[in-house]
Amino acid sequence: MRERFQYNKAIVMFYLNEVLLKEEMPARARRLFIETFRKYHKLDGGDENIALHLAFKAVERRYVKLNNRWI
C-alpha cells in the first residue's frame, strides 16, 4: 500500500510541475496553487479535476492574468 501511495504522489507532483511551468506563475502564486491543490486532492481516490479547478480559483482571487502572465 505504501508503494502505491508513493507512486501516485510522484505522478501527481509531476503533473503539477507541468501545469505550473505552462502557467508561468510567480513563486507565491505557485505556493498557493500547490497548497490548495493538496488540500482538496486525496491521493487515494480524490478527483484531480476538482482540486485543479479550486487551486486555479484560489490563484485567480489573488492574482490577475495579463498577457499570459500572472501578476
Swiss-Prot record:
Q: State the SUPFAM superfamilies in the record.
A: ChaB-like
Enumerate the InterPro entries for this protein: ChaB, ChaB_sf
Could you tell me what this protein is called? Uncharacterized protein in LEF8-FP intergenic region
